[in-house]
Every structure is written in C-alpha cells, then in structure tokens.
Amino acid sequence: MQQRDLRRQGFFDFHHQRTGIHCRRIRHDPGAEPFSTGSKARDKARVDALATEIDKLQDLFYADRRYKLLVVLQGTDTSGKDGTIRGVFGRTSALGVHTVAWKAPTSDERAHDFLWRIHERVPGDGEVVIFNRSHYEDVLVPVVNAWITPEQTRQRYQQIN
C-alpha cells in the first residue's frame, strides 16, 4: 500500500523536485452531497457566494505571491466544464487567473515528454490556473485510438500513477 501511495504522488514529487514547492492533492469525497440543493434560486445564490469568496481569495493569492492553485475539471463533452468556469471563476480578476483548454498536442509538444505541456502551464506564485480537462486524456485518447505503443502506454501510466 505504501508503495502505491508513493507512485500516486509521482507528479507532485516531480513538481516538488523541479520547483522546490510542495504540492498536495485535495480530493473530492465521492460520497459527499451534490452541490445542487434542488432549488435554482438557492443554487444561484450559493454559486454567487462562492464566486465572491474565490475572487477575494484570488486577490490575496495575487498580492501575497506565496500560494498557487490548480483546478482540474474533467468531464465528458457537454458535462458543464465551461459553464462551471464561467459561473464560478467568471467574476474573478483577470490578473492571476488563467484557463487552459487542452487540445490535440502541437508538433512542438509532441517532440517532448507527454507531460511537458502540462508542466509548462501549472500556476506560478500568486496564480490560479484552471485546466479544462486533464493530463489523463493524454493517456486515454492515444490508447483508445491505438496511437501509441503498449510500451509508451505503460510508461505514461507509470508517470501518472
């Protein structure tokens, strides 16, 4: 079990070695109650309050330059990722908040390790970065479409697990 836990932290360990900054993963509890209360008016009020709080926190992040936040939204097409970004982060200052929508890798990105483009876009000090989709798709899509060899697949799994 301990060895598996260490492998799961591979990305964070790599980032720590590269930058000297310790990262920690915050996981959503799948057993938690959904955000929706069943009332559109109450849900809108909750999103408004959350957006206001995020805007204030982002201002502190930007001014303090000690902390950073990476938000990764993963879901199928039409699952609400763009709407979540607009609704929750749309009212924050453009200073220090960036959204990255991952598309097919460019030829320059393909010339590097598959996580290279991910590492290039993680937040800097004082920044909030939102990933619209995750690096897991750079494993899943090529495997499903047989674009990479079984050895490349194994290597990618090792890097993200």
Predicted regions and their residues:
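Glycine-rich phosphate-binding loop of ATP-dependent small-molecule kinases
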Residues: 4-161
